[in-house]
């Protein structure tokens, strides 16, 4: 194999696609069951009430309601508050 580059070759030209991570639904926003709230690598946010966690650590709503971000035992958690419990 050649160890020197040939004519018009380059060692550059590679780039990976963005992973589109981050918060998808913000505090106070209404979500339906199954809607993705946060896409993440690792548990930056932990699931709280009425929130499930996928195998890739994605957080999603288990029932309809409003998103609430908070803290529990020093961890950042995401909760979904059911519609009836949210004051007008």
Curated annotation (Swiss-Prot):
GO molecular function terms attached to this record: structural constituent of ribosome
PROSITE patterns (UniProt xref): RIBOSOMAL_L27
Protein keywords: Ribonucleoprotein, Ribosomal protein
Top-level taxon of the source organism: Bacteria
Biased composition (Polar residues): 7-19
InterPro entries the UniProt entry points to: Ribosomal_bL27 (IPR001684), Ribosomal_bL27_CS (IPR018261)
Pfam families, sorted: Ribosomal_L27 (PF01016)
A GO-annotated cellular component: cytosolic large ribosomal subunit
Example of a GO biological process term: translation
Ribosomal protein as UniProt keyword: yes
Stretches the record annotates as Disordered: 1-21
Gene3D superfamilies named among the record's database cross-references: 2.40.50.100
Family from the record: Belongs to the bacterial ribosomal protein bL27 family.
Record protein name field: Large ribosomal subunit protein bL27
Gene behind the chain: rpmA
């Amino acid at each position: 194999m050649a160890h020197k580059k040939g004519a018009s070759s380059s060692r550059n030209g590679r780039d990976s696609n963005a992973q589109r991570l981050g918060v998808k639904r913000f505090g106070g926003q209404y979500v339906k069951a199954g809607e993705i709230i946060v896409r993440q690598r690792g548990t930056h946010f932990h699931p709280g009430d009425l929130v499930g966690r996928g195998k890739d650590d994605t957080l999603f709503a288990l029932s309809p309601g409003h998103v609430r971000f908070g803290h529990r035992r020093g961890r950042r958690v995401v909760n979904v508050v059911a519609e009836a419990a949210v004051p007008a």
